[in-house]
């Protein structure tokens, strides 16, 4: 870049020296030589400006590339910072799922070992309830249901008297009220004789029955016993 100005000064000084030595020379040759030197000087100026502008362009290009690299790096860091919590949460969830899977595998292995038959007549301390025990518990629940239903029917029908002549049922003095009750007959042959099946009330409100407290107590006791039996079955 500094070579062209020095060359231009050297050419100009030689031309001036030549003009002073040959002052009596031909003017056409001198004018042509001067014109050539001026053209060369302008060419050098253009080359210098071109190289200068190319250098500026290269510097601008390198600066823009540096700025673009910094911007790209900042964008990458921003994306990493934004995605880092999600990545950490996914890693924690994956770790918890793996721990849960290992826990389930250990439980399954322990269950399979406990369900295997034990030799030398040793009883198992843990394991599922056998089918025989389940059947026994089911029978207990069924018997409890039958007993509670029979006691409930006996309390609800307590105090009802059947009048043979009128074919209706009246309440006794314990209920302190009388109401018409339809007596439904079902003919069943039991030991070659007819028996009457059940009563059905029509005009009586269930809540006005004095035996309602007894019935509710029976239901509560039945519910509690049924829950206890179900807990024993599930244990």
From Swiss-Prot:
The keyword Membrane is assigned to this record: yes
Presence of keyword Transcription regulation: no
Membrane topology per record: Single-pass membrane protein
GO cellular component: lipid droplet; membrane
Residues with Phosphoserine modification: 177
Keywords: Lipid droplet, Membrane, Phosphoprotein, Transmembrane, Transmembrane helix
Broad class of the protein's primary localization: other
Annotated localization: Lipid droplet; Membrane
Miscellaneous field: Present with 922 molecules/cell in log phase SD medium. Open reading frame exhibits genomic organization compatible with a translational readthrough-dependent mode of expression.
Protein name: Bypass of stop codon protein 2
Species name: Saccharomyces cerevisiae (strain ATCC 204508 / S288c) (Baker's yeast)
Taxonomic lineage from the root: Eukaryota, Fungi, Dikarya, Ascomycota, Saccharomycotina
